[in-house]
Amino acid sequence: MQTIICVEQLSKTFNQHQALHAVDLNIHHGEMVALLGPSGSGKSTLLRHLSGLITGDKSAGSHIELLGRTVQREGRLARDIRKSRANTGYIFQQFNLVNRLSVLENVLIGALGSTPFWRTCFSWFTREQKQRALQALTRVGMAHFAYQRVSTLSGGQQQRVAIARALMQQAKVILADEPIASLDPESARIVMDTLRDINQNDGITVVVTLHQVDYALRYCERIVALRQGHVFYDGSSQQFDNERFDHLYRSINRVEENAKAA
């Protein structure tokens, strides 16, 4: 299988706290992978490194590649990082949309990387680009909201607009950081259904960080679980059993309880 994301010996230290410890990870074309773990495990930190939003420690041998391009090496971003980012759609927990713009205009933002600069200054998008944006909204069930201001939408609807923007970008990889953390169960289901649909029908590789184990088991064939910055488990979701769940979550809770008692 073609390797889409390659992480080698990635470490990250914030002040004196080491968030990631020499992480190695390979993700293949067409996979939908859940990064799982309790708060502070390093899963969101790892995801941000994949698109170069943050850089790792300057440790020898550390390296991240995405779609065959270097994203960062030994704590330094690649000079052509924009080319890697152009192929990566990033979906944030807090939606990261422009509230004053319409739904359609927010989706068209996904085309900025492939639009001449002078046109972007005036928001001049072609008819073909607008048609593609409407098609992306249709894919996520949001076309009938196209001309509505995005600030009027619910959280789940805004998250689907963010996914449509990634489709407009023609991203080959989607990195979703806690996309359902603030959503009600029905909205969370719709968002995860949408991510699975584009993964299965468009062949887009999806990496999603989750707190909810049940969603990871239901939607992702592979789970990468992090515990205190280390890869604790990397394998089939079917083999992520109660014993592993207990060791991943409840042992962390016991450590926190002991710290409070002390």
From Swiss-Prot:
Listed CDD domains: ABC_PhnC_transporter
PROSITE patterns the UniProt entry points to: ABC_TRANSPORTER_1 (PS00211), ABC_TRANSPORTER_2 (PS50893), PHNC (PS51249)
Enzyme class: translocase
Record keywords: ATP-binding, Cell inner membrane, Cell membrane, Membrane, Nucleotide-binding, Phosphonate transport, Translocase, Transport
Subunit structure: The complex is composed of two ATP-binding proteins (PhnC), two transmembrane proteins (PhnE) and a solute-binding protein (PhnD).
Name of the encoding gene: phnC
Record membrane topology: Peripheral membrane protein
Organism: Escherichia coli O157:H7
The protein's name: Phosphonates import ATP-binding protein PhnC
